[in-house]
Amino acid sequence: VLSARAHPSDLPVLRDETATDTAGSPVGAAVRRAPGADRVRLDRGVPPDLPLELVMELVGVFVGGLSGALAAIRKQFDIFGIVVLAWAAGLGGGLMRDVLIGAFPPVGIGRWEFILTACLAGVTMYFFHPRLERARRMIAVFDAGALALFTVVGTVKGLSLGAGPTASVCVGVITGVGGGVLRDLLTGEVPVVLHHRQLYAIPAVIGASCTVALWSTSSLSTLTVGLAVGLVLGLRLVAMRFHLNVPGPWRGGVRGG
């Protein structure tokens, strides 16, 4: 039996039945299972620790941090404010997710490599922002990838801790969009996901729902996780390429654009 590691941002891991608490009863080596979590097991297909996915998540944190730092620079923040906003944008979604599902310490304060990656993104933008600002389109593409990965990872983590299908979809979407929401709130803006009518949260909802469906049919594997990530990424990129927007409010028989 594989032993779980204290790794708040990983996909679900096997429970170590040999570990015991102070009363001598078996417990998970990393965290206690939530009620109902016994029916949610790793043998449904997700490997316990995939370095590639960890690397991809770190890349997502870095790119999210770049977007936060860029927003801070546009607001004329100092170096401290830039780094703080990079941390918020890169790790805000995971932080919200872990607080909601009771995974402590949250990834935003409990994993030094994630914190360092987000802060490094802030420092990088501080020194190189004239060049990086011209690469906004590329950053937007990477941000779409971060949205896709965080959504699927967040959904699987919710399922692994015993959350129901609806709750797990919500957890996945919050993980995907939470960093951007926190970034916008800290800069005094209405979150983009709420007012720009972009297809941003909708791809996350679709991807999280597909992940739950795969889990419930025992079809979740490394391949299908990758396909779910690709689905969210593809929908977001298509929306960006063809300027697909969510309809605005209905005004006197004319739909808002």
Give each language-model segment a name:
Residues L54-S67, L85-A88, G207:
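The first (N-terminal) embedded transmembrane alpha-helix
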Residues F80-A88, R111-I115, R136-L147, V171, ...:
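Cytoplasmic-side transmembrane-helix entry/capping segments in multi-pass membrane proteins
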Residues R44-L52, V99-I109, V153-A167, A213-T224:
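Helix-coil boundary and interhelical linker segments in multi-pass alpha-helical membrane proteins
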Residues I101-I109, E133-I139, G158-S168, L186-H196, ...:
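A cytosolic-side transmembrane-helix exit/cap motif
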Residues A86-G94, F142-V156, Q198-V212, G256-G257:
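Small-residue-rich segments of transmembrane alpha-helices in multi-pass membrane proteins
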Residues D49-V61, P106-L120, G164-V177:
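Structural signature of hydrophobic alpha-helical transmembrane segments
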Residues G65-Q76, D98, V123-R136, V181-V193, ...:
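C-terminal ends of transmembrane helices
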Residues V84-A88, L95-I101, C170, I174, ...:
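Short, structured motif recognition centered on aromatic/hydrophobic residues
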